[in-house]
């Protein structure tokens, strides 16, 4: 039995609140249960120096957690003077996931920076960030299209979403919350596109290695979960 009482293939309640920020070109407050992440997409009329005059744009991401997003207050990384390895890993993952579905030449020589700020954490912050970041990116591109800067359908090639899976109490489960994640025998994150393409898989065994059969079970849970998330994205942007 899962601590939340959910079935093995049951995700937490997911919601997307678009246009959460009045300043950003695109924004979304995404909720995966008690994990809440504010995703904002900001347009910059420039590209990194190494891309200058290259005829294409760039999409990048930054990730952070508010000091009291967790049970005990964490020190701000800015006050510590450096980002943790975890933060750097997650923001690179978010950026890679978004770029997998963007036609960078169609964006022109512009950069979209997506900031994912965790307001409240209860497991799965990176997967919620990726899934919500896609909505924010979509709305930023829609803002640009309204000003004749790009064609949305030419720049954004597909959906992308992410979900965590793991083996908890010897059972494969989807969308782990913190209690499950901290006690899981295996923990994995999957990033996939709307057409079923795999962007990234991260999987780790805690003590006991997992079998190929167990991995196949996690993969199936992830595939079905991400398909659900992408349908939710479609409903959100249609509203």
Curated annotation (Swiss-Prot):
SUPFAM superfamilies listed in its UniProt record: Ribonuclease PH domain 2-like (SSF55666), Ribosomal protein S5 domain 2-like (SSF54211)
Recorded catalytic activity of this chain's protein: tRNA(n+1) + phosphate = tRNA(n) + a ribonucleoside 5'-diphosphate
UniProt EC number: 2.7.7.56
InterPro entries in the cross-refs: ExoRNase_PH_dom1, ExoRNase_PH_dom2, ExoRNase_PH_dom2_sf, PNPase/RNase_PH_dom_sf, Ribosomal_Su5_D2-typ_SF, RNase_PH, RNase_PH_bac-type, RNase_PH_CS
Biological processes, Gene Ontology terms: rRNA catabolic process; rRNA processing; tRNA processing
Annotated family: Belongs to the RNase PH family.
Name of the protein in question: Ribonuclease PH
Self-association state and partner proteins as the record states: Homohexameric ring arranged as a trimer of dimers.
CDD domains: RNase_PH_bact
Chain sites annotated for binding phosphate: 86, 124-126
NCBIfam families the record matches: RNasePH
Main function: Phosphorolytic 3'-5' exoribonuclease that plays an important role in tRNA 3'-end maturation. Removes nucleotide residues following the 3'-CCA terminus of tRNAs; can also add nucleotides to the ends of RNA molecules by using nucleoside diphosphates as substrates, but this may not be physiologically important. Probably plays a role in initiation of 16S rRNA degradation (leading to ribosome degradation) during starvation.
Enzyme class: transferase
Domain of life: Bacteria
Keyword RNA-binding part of the UniProt annotation: yes
PANTHER family with a match to the protein in the record: EXOSOME COMPLEX COMPONENT (PTHR11953), EXOSOME COMPLEX COMPONENT RRP41 (PTHR11953:SF0)
Gene Ontology molecular functions: 3'-5'-RNA exonuclease activity; tRNA binding; tRNA nucleotidyltransferase activity
UniProt keywords, alphabetically: Nucleotidyltransferase, RNA-binding, rRNA processing, Transferase, tRNA processing, tRNA-binding
């Amino acid at each position: 039995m899962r601590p939340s009482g959910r079935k093995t293939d049951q995700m937490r309640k997911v919601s997307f609140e678009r246009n959460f920020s009045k300043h950003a070109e695109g924004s979304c407050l995404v909720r995966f249960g008690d994990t809440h992440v504010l995703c904002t997409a900001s347009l910059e009329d420039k590209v990194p120096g190494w891309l200058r005059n290259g005829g294409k744009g760039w999409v990048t991401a930054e990730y952070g957690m508010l000091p009291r997003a967790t049970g005990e207050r964490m020190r701000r990384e800015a006050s510590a003077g450096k980002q943790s390895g975890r933060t750097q890993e997650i923001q690179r993952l978010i950026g890679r996931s978004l770029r997998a579905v963007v036609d960078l030449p169609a964006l022109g020589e512009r950069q979209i920076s997506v900031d994912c700020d965790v307001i409240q954490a209860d497991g799965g912050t990176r997967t919620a960030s990726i899934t919500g970041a896609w909505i924010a990116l979509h709305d930023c591109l829609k803002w640009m299209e309204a000003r004749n800067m790009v064609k949305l359908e030419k720049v954004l090639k597909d959906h992308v979403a992410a979900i965590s899976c793991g083996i908890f109490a010897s059972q494969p489960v989807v969308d782990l919350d913190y209690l499950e994640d901290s006690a899981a025998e295996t923990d994995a994150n999957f990033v996939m596109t709307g057409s079923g393409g795999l962007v990234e898989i991260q999987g780790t065994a805690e003590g006991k290695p997992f079998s190929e059969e167990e991995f196949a079970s996690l993969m199936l849970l992830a595939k079905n979960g991400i398909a659900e998330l992408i349908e939710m994205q479609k409903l959100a942007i249609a509203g």
